[in-house]
Amino acid sequence: AIAGLKNKGAKKFIIDLRENSGGFMDQAINMVNEFLPANRLIVYAEGKAYKRFEAMSDGKGSCIHEPLAVLIDEFSASASEIFSGAIQDNDRGIIVGRRSFGKGLVQQQFTLSDGSAVRLTVARYFTPSGRCIQKPYELGKADEYEKDFLNRLMHGDAGNKDSIQHAD
């Protein structure tokens, strides 16, 4: 897709991840790899019983030098946050929009003996600078989620999509 756009003369790129609820980590890594030079950390994940995993760029991407902007909103989650976090932390492009959803968990599927499966959270992922995107939760402090949402609502950060002020 990128090669086709470049063949048609595209010189700058905007990746719109608004309302993108995510996907698979490997696909996010493949996408980011298109925009980063070699040997840049894309994402890492670790958990209590999950060996640390690091994904590095290979420098073979087709848009390593072109200007880049990434659009996100409060519904951009998971793989969208991996992509935007890697672009931001590697100073590769500009991130425009609202604070993202905050889903930074790695899930693994386990097949059961009857053929069904269960997906369990096994780790958290972190952006190259070490930020964990996952919203914090401490047992017994669920009201913090509500306080966060109310604070965002009061400051026009949760419901008003036109909260950015600009001159006419």
How would you describe each model-predicted region?
Residues 119-120:
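Short, small/polar residue-rich loop motifs at catalytic or cofactor-binding pockets
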